[in-house]
Design a protein with these regions (language model features):
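Phosphate-centric recognition/catalysis
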Residues: 65
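Surface-exposed, charge/polar-rich loops and edge strands
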Residues: 1-62, 73-246
Length: 246
């Protein structure tokens, strides 16, 4: 293919053109995909903020028939911690220090529901084979937290095996409620409650309002569009020649 442009000739090779078109379209696709991800994050941020500002729901007085109505809402509950079972979520970092999130089953008063409560962060300690120092709360208490799905975990480098550190203290690589229910023989509700910082009976809780991260995706989108533009310029420059040099 030859296209005359004044005293210049644009004459790209077929194989070069094919590769250029493929990667150009790929970069454009990835750019728009990142913009779509940014929009999703923006929508979630708006949803989260709205839910977080709504009135606290008392789980003792409200039947959980539709979990989507409770998701990311602040909730309160009166009941007892089942302290004989402590779940440690491994590989959690706070201020650059390795540690665990401590989850404890919580039986809601006058209800069959038992929730895993994320009570916050504790350091691992000097010996990973020993349980960290834990607090034990006896008797009936009232807690406040955020109603949410079990936390997502990235790619695991090892299987999610249950590691017993001592009687009643088990370490997991991820929170999979069905697996924890099987291990503890407790019929757990398939959602968790993350204890609010102002609520008692917890550990270190540096929870932060979720950042939507939309600006990160927008930045990535600009990068992909920049790659597409750069590819187009390189393709054009490398395939244009003066008349008589073709």
């Amino acid at each position: 293919m030859k296209i005359n442009i004044g005293n210049l000739v644009f004459c790209p090779r077929l194989i070069t053109t094919i590769f250029a078109v493929i990667f150009f379209l790929l970069f454009i696709y990835l750019g728009f995909w990142q913009l779509d991800r940014a929009e999703q994050k923006r929508e979630f941020q708006s949803f989260y903020n709205e839910r977080h500002q709504e009135e606290i729901i008392n789980l003792n007085n409200n039947l959980i028939s539709n979990t989507s109505d409770f998701l990311w809402r602040r909730v309160s509950a009166t009941g007892i911690f089942l302290e004989e079972q402590q779940i440690l979520l491994d590989n959690q970092v706070n201020a650059g220090q390795a540690g665990y999130y401590v989850y404890t089953p919580f039986k809601i008063k006058n209800s069959p529901d038992i929730f895993l409560i994320n009570r916050g962060w504790v350091p691992v300690g000097k010996d990973r084979n020993k349980s960290p120092k834990l607090i034990f709360t006896e008797g009936e208490v009232t807690i406040e937290g955020v109603f949410k799905k079990e936390p997502r975990t990235g790619v695991l480098l090892m299987e999610n095996k249950a590691e017993k550190l001592e009687d009643g203290v088990t370490r997991f690589q991820k929170i999979a409620i069905s697996e924890i229910s099987d291990k503890t023989k407790i019929n757990l509700f398939p959602y968790v409650i993350r204890l609010l910082p102002e609520s008692k009976h917890g550990y270190i809780r540096n929870w932060k309002l979720r950042n939507s991260g939309e600006n990160v995706h927008i930045g990535y989108a600009y990068q992909w569009f920049a790659f597409a533009t750069t590819l187009f310029i390189i393709y054009f420059v490398l395939n244009i020649k003066r008349q008589g040099y073709v």
